[in-house]
Amino acid sequence: TAAAPASASSAGGGSVDERGIDQSVRANSPKADLERLFNSPAVHELKEQICDVGRRLWQRAYVDGNGGNLSIRLTEDVVLCTPTLVSKGFMKPEDLCLVDLDGNQLAGVKKRTSEILMHLSIMKAQPKARAVSHAHPPYATGFAVAGVQPPTCMIPEIEVFIGRVPIAPYETPGTPEMGLKVAELVDKHNTVLMENHGVVSWSNTIEDAYFKMEIVEAYCRTVLVTTQLGVQPKQFSPKHLKDLLDIKQKLGVPDPRIGLKECELCDNDEWRPGVTCAVPAKGGESTSATDPEAETVVKAVTDEILNRLKG
């Protein structure tokens, strides 16, 4: 089990963290204590944050229907999460749920999200994951459906705040297997594409987990636009990426690429833009490749049509 959120002793002798949450409450605490935690002012503030992020996900079309889910770890084994069958754009604080690390519901009138097991797997595998955001932003999800890992060394911001974005193999949503596939990647990555599914990001706050979702979606959108301009996308050099990694290291932001040789950075051998544009190259020359055999067939058909028209 992952470590509990950091806490400090209160004046009354209890254990309260910087969010004002009583860390002495556990999943096996008396129901009255769990209800008191669930309805406390500190947790209500976190409920409001989740509802706010849910609205932003919905407004940006990162979720549709009842899709997407959010969670915040409150204590060692108690987690606040979104309900199932509720639009993230219209959630209210009273809709949220309380669960333990096995997914058993502890409080809340609505049923917890079916995908909470993935959130809990992430929290167990990564002690720093105190908040998790899962959604289906269309551009990043497009990469996930295509099974294409977003290329690196194109825009500095994603390198600093996220880094390389891996793809977790597909598993049925809501199953323990899906959570385990994602959890295998969160020790080195804060944002993961889920094959044929969507995106999940984690951080110490739900706001920052959402920021990461925004960053990866904007990046994937930019990359897709770039591939349609009829030119080979430009990358900055491995040396420039190393400079960014040095900045991350000074800031204390982990990245598995820190310490690699320059020749091992910006490796996008698997990146193959799948869209070409019909914009002619400079000088009016066509960028399309031609098949001589196909051209011969086209010419023969054209000549035959012209001969018949003349006759």
Identify the function of each model-found stretch:
Residues 1-311:
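Glycine-rich flexible loops
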